[in-house]
């Protein structure tokens, strides 16, 4: 006689769990009616794009480093579709200005802006189609969708179009331009998009509110240790020790999850990239130009990303499941 009651309780529990899981799995998309928001978006994009063009146009064509599209992708992936035109227009204008002032000049401004927007749109549309729960870094499957959209679709198309423009306007060959675009934009997308998404979704603030002082102290200590190891490897060591940062990187992935892993990748990209461009670090042993060494460094960072972020995403999925029990 008690079974119906138990079934009812079980059904109620399952519905409650499903509701909780749905709430956890579907972050609320941002929406703002402020006119200041697209202006701020465009200004951030312009500053990041201009710095990339000033610092990393080693061969007179494309920038070898590019992180501004990661900002646009994060904006699109965390906002409602009706807010996309504002961000797209703002970033398109910013891209055109940066190219005109610091890149290949006014003739390339419009086509390069269109290609930058196309890349971000492809990633956003593919992820919105195949990751309906909006939790892009929440599991290995959703992370794989993002990686395939960025590396296998968007930048194959965008690199081809950009290389055609560069080959017509400069002396840089189609093949070299294609590789410069692909490596620079893939590295920028992999490095910065996940942490920007977590920040824009409020996950960073939520982590600070929910975690205790002990956890925060551990996070600071581990990231400081990782930064110190990275500085030693890229600035002071005279031996090829590129494998050394991988151990603390994996440890951070297990202890701090996706937030810590994303922060560590940014630290690695920032310190290692600055050292490589400045002529320091183990990559100076490679023959070739600064551009060649930068591309090799981008490959190294991409492999580091693929080593730690899927692990962090899988652990994050398990934590959510245990939290529902």
List each language-model region with its residue ranges.
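Acidic, Ala/Val/Gly-enriched low-complexity intrinsically disordered segments
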Residues: 7, 18-21
